[in-house]
Structures are given as C-alpha cells and as structure tokens.
C-alpha cells in the first residue's frame, strides 16, 4: 500500500467542504472511506496534493425512510458504510435488491470502510445497477443548496465538482410474482473488477403480459446503464421463445461495454444477454 502524501483537510459542514474544493480546485479530491481512491492509487494514479475528508460532516451519516407524495423513500447519507447497508433492518426488509448488490462488493474489510456515496461517486460501483432499476436519485450540494438528480442522468452527464450528500431510493411495491434479480459475474478479490454486473425488475399481469421492466448493466470499468431499448421491447409482450430470441439480440446490441485484457466486449455482452434470458424464463415459470 502506498504511503499517503496528500494534505488532509477536515471540514465540519458542507459549505466549508465546498469552499475548500473551490479554493484548491484540481489539486484536491473529496474522500470518505478511501477505498475508491485506494483502488486508483494501486493502479498507478497520482495522489492529489490535497484530500478533503468528509468524515466529520455528520449530516452525511443520516439514514431514514420518509414518505413523499404517497410514496416511501429510503434516504442514505453518503457516508453510510456499505456494511451498514447490509445490517440495517429497514433496508433488508424493504430494499432487498440493494442489500443483495452491496453484499457482492469486495471483502468485508472493504465494506466496513467503503461508503455508499463513494461507490456511486466511482461511477462504476457494483451497487449502481441495482440503484438504477430502483430509479434512485442523488442529492448533490452545489455551494448553495442540495439538488436532487436522477442517478441515470447523473451518470450520463459530467458533475465532477458535485459533493454527493445522499442517495434517495423509492420503495417499489411489487407483487411476489415479479422477478427481482442482481447478478455479478466474475471474481472480485480486493480491488479487481467484475465481468458483468446486472440488475432487473420484471413483472407480468394476470394475463401473462409483461407490464413492468427495468434493466441495468455494467461491470469492470464500464459505467452501468439502463437497457431502455430492451425494456421497451418487453413491454406488453408475453414470454415465449420468439421473444427470448429477440431479447438476446437486443441486449447484445444495446449493452456496449469496453473489453480489457481479460474479457472482451462481446463476452461481456453475451453474458449479460444470457442472464436476462435466464431471468425471463423464471418469470415464464411463474405464469
């Protein structure tokens, strides 16, 4: 492990952290658990001159559920440890897909340090596919106010200066017949990447017609993305062999990961398509 050479700043509120970031600019980075930056440093990335630690900003440690507009939401402060996401009874009971995703992240020692905010801030975190299909929002402090941004939009835009304050996840009230899945393919010891991470929620009505479909895929150094074309293909259709064949083709086409020295892009796409087909077959069995 490399020796830390950066100067550490310890602000106690959001405005102070923001002011430091504006003052130090590109020579600085926000840091919480540190596992994200440790990953980058182990791969040879240079250490910044200044690190702005967020660990003394208590507002970022909040975790609660709140109703808004008739819907229930989970509010996760950016400093909530990944391990706490696994242990918290509310999350386990009402947001099990998030629990399942977090359980796959690295080793227990890393989860004890790593934060949910850091996992999202990485833009390639394993929790992101699950958060995408639950249509989570990100709370970001812009120096004046905390704004809410759809996670999907946040990933597709550049918000490099944003200070993530919380992740807000709506509760999905779905019938037991719906298929909820999260799969991570590939070994992940310490800081090595996965082949594919994919999540989905798919449901059908009493007539066997698909009336709910959300899919998201990522893996390795690839930013997770919603598979909206595939979702549209599924809407209003019944699970049958012709549809399964078409879905495999569309997932393979829509999912556009980058390959590396270990796994080609086509291999990742094929794995993602195979997983979606397997989950659709489970839905067919419930019909």
PLM regions with names:
Residues 1-287:
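C-terminal structural segment of proteins
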